[in-house]
């Protein structure tokens, strides 16, 4: 479940400034693009760039989140390159892409660009957690399964799913089999 986990330490901040310098060689253009002159938050030199955590500028916060997702993609690409040097031709590379979470998997994971990160994988892998018992609808399995299948335009592996005995999570008799068939019906191997 590799994602950015809110990484924002000093090294990441410095890397973000370098990323912005490359994207906006003219600091005046950067200030205009992000509305920093208007909000009296102008950055006069790159060396004076403030810590971006807690910024009131949503455009800047969104660009930093985009950069954090880029770091995840670079990290996974680096890992996949290492593994590629050691794996046999019949072996594959995967990673556990998870989804946003509110009591269960509900949609896109905001801390990783799964489509970009999956490029270095051989097979998409995911975890899909969904309600059980009378709350099981199949919506989470279908929605997250569709995302997973589209990462590589192929079938995917379910690396984790709902199979524990937590209160109200324990499936009804036969429901675990139903869930497995639902994953298969949505493109899981």
Predicted regions located by residue number:
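Short amphipathic alpha-helical segments and helix-helix/interface helices
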Residues: 80, 114, 145-148, 180
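Hydrophobic faces of well-ordered beta-strands that scaffold small-molecule active sites
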Residues: 93-95, 124-126, 155-160, 189
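Short, structured coil segments at secondary-structure junctions
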Residues: 119-120, 151-152, 186-187
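Glycine-rich nucleotide phosphate-binding loop and flanking beta-alpha elements
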Residues: 131-132, 165, 183
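Helix-enriched interaction subdomains in cytosolic or periplasmic regions
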Residues: 175, 179-189
């Amino acid at each position: 479940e590799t994602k950015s986990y809110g990484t924002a330490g000093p090294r990441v901040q410095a890397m973000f400034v370098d990323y912005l310098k490359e994207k906006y060689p003219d600091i005046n253009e950067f200030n205009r693009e992000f509305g920093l002159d208007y909000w009296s938050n102008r950055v006069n030199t790159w060396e004076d760039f403030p810590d971006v955590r807690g910024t009131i500028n949503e455009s800047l916060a969104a660009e930093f989140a985009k950069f954090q997702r880029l770091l995840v993609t670079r990290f996974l690409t680096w890992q996949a390159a290492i593994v590629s040097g050691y794996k046999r031709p019949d072996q594959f590379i995967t990673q556990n892409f998870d989804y946003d979470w509110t009591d269960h998997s509900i949609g896109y994971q905001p801390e990783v660009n799964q489509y970009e990160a999956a490029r270095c994988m051989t097979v998409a892998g995911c975890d899909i957690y969904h309600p059980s018992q009378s709350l099981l609808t199949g919506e989470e399995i279908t929605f997250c399964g569709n995302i997973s299948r589209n990462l590589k335009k192929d079938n995917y592996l379910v690396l984790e799913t709902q199979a524990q005995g937590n209160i109200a999570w324990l499936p009804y008799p036969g429901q675990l089999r139903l869930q497995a068939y639902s994953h298969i019906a949505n493109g899981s191997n």
